[in-house]
Amino acid sequence: MSKTITIADDVYYELVKMKGNKSFSELLRELIGKKKKGNLDILMIAFGTMSEEEVKEFKKKIKEVEEWINSWTPVS
């Protein structure tokens, strides 16, 4: 049985980029299953949909956040 859902255009276009040759149902099943496993799996899905430039920028941002966290001084 199929159901109709309404989503925002921007969400639709992100799902289209992520799904590749899969059906929307397959993609959503995968995302729901990954949610149960953790955020790292979700990031791995995202990396598969990013261009090389987007991956580089994402890694750069992660490094900046890590450096920022490492700069914190412990409070006694």
Swiss-Prot record:
Entry superkingdom: Archaea
Disulfide bonds: none
NCBIfam families referenced in this protein's UniProt entry, alphabetically: PRK13696.1-2
Organism: Pyrococcus abyssi (strain GE5 / Orsay)
Keyword annotations of the record: Toxin-antitoxin system
HAMAP family: UPF0330
Claim: Metal-binding is one of the keywords in the record: no
Residue intervals passing through the bilayer: none
Designated name of the protein: Putative antitoxin VapB2
Function text: Possibly the antitoxin component of a type II toxin-antitoxin (TA) system. Its cognate toxin is VapC2 (Potential).
InterPro entries membership: Put_antitoxin
Family that this chain belongs to: Belongs to the UPF0330 family.
Presence of keyword Cell membrane: no
Phylogenetic classification of the source organism: Archaea, Methanobacteriati, Methanobacteriota, Thermococci, Thermococcales
